[in-house]
């Protein structure tokens, strides 16, 4: 499907969970001849990341309202109005055929600006429970899609766009069937790490002994303290890295993952075909719990919520999974994934632009 001459503006910012799926869709459409620009904020990760992908970015000034003081809330309508004016001026100059909102504060003023100019607004909700911005924008959107069922009652479930190197991994049967020796446990707390996993997993390693080998992503500035915790637990042999650049290689190595359940992490683990022990971040709306629930229901994962997390709970869960069980869970994870999510989102963007 050629997009020659068509123009898309992607609105996404703040976290990798919003930005990376947006980049996947942008690259897919650029390969079809689309022109793509990005709407973001200058002080968040998209400011550095998006230009590295060969995409020009425009900035508006906007930030979140949750947890702000009364003065900030009083000033909020004016700030939103100014951000809307900035976004509207950018869109009047660029003249996109369609805008794609992938979440983050920038999507709010951007979506309203597009709607006020008669530009179709397509939304994608990455999480199992809808964010505030997308809840508002859904009322004016041309099309609403969701990664997991339940965020919106009638929205199409299309999955989350994930990186092509993860999608290219061999299927679980090819990867895991012949494996022997200690079970390979990948511990991931997101790019910032997760203090609770950094504190718990060295003690889990001590309980499980030689039955596991662990690769632990500690997050920024925590590598030394986590290595020390493993050494003090009598388990210095395990690998601790601050950040994992090649997640596809880490998934290929692993037999099971112990991790938080951010939307992109859950979708990548399903696409890779891996069993998981999820420890959702304790957010007010339990967003990460709802992200992980479909894989637990599919028999591909177990959720331990943070108040119930203990060394024994993790150790007993991992010890209870034989290699045969892990392979069955891995196959269920892969079966629950939506590997063509990028294409599905891109197709809806194309349809909205032609309507």
Curated annotation (Swiss-Prot):
UDP-N-acetyl-alpha-D-glucosamine binds at residues 15-17, 127, 163, 191, 244, 263-268, 288. It is a peripheral membrane protein. InterPro entries: GlcNAc_MurG, Glyco_trans_28_C, GlycoTrans_28_N. Keywords: Cell cycle, Cell division, Cell inner membrane, Cell membrane, Cell shape, Cell wall biogenesis/degradation, Glycosyltransferase, Membrane, Peptidoglycan synthesis, Transferase. CDD domains: GT28_MurG (cd03785). It comes from the Bacteria. Belongs to the glycosyltransferase 28 family. MurG subfamily. This is UDP-N-acetylglucosamine--N-acetylmuramyl-(pentapeptide) pyrophosphoryl-undecaprenol N-acetylglucosamine transferase.
